[in-house]
Amino acid sequence: MKTQRGYTLIETLVAMLILVMLSASGLYGWQYWQQSQRLWQTASQARDYLLYLREDANWHNRDHSISVIREGTLWCLVSSAAGANTCHGSSPLVFVPRWPEVEMSDLTPSLAFFGLRNTAWAGHIRFKNSTGEWWLVVSPWGRLRLCQQGETEGCL
């Protein structure tokens, strides 16, 4: 740095190496954060969908049995009241996740909401991707909670 004409080749290469290392670690951290946000948003949107089904069952005094439809890598949650056999369409009784990398790995087969006394068949739905897992837990009284893997207290 004592030369009059600028930086030496070694100084430039060291600066470039530091810049590349910081950029690579920042890119990895950003991708991990983005994947974890997509997982959380999918679980939250599924919770909102189930809240809608619970309120609809109570308001119209009808039952909503939830099932999953898989079409290749695409999956969706469908209410029995929708009468749909596909993930395509714009029915509010069908939930299609925005991001295909979020998987639904487990669903209680008899998960349902009943209009009579606003009750539910207890169960859970598990969402996962490369960053972790979220559980959507339904109680017999229709309470919905989001729990992260390994979390025993403080479910949302």
From Swiss-Prot:
It is found in: Membrane. It comes from the Bacteria. PROSITE patterns: PROKAR_NTER_METHYL. The modification N-methyltyrosine is found at residue 7. One of its GO terms (cellular component) is membrane. InterPro entries: N_methyl_site, Pilin-like. Its main location: membrane. Keywords: Membrane, Methylation, Transmembrane, Transmembrane helix. Not yet known. This is Prepilin peptidase-dependent protein A.
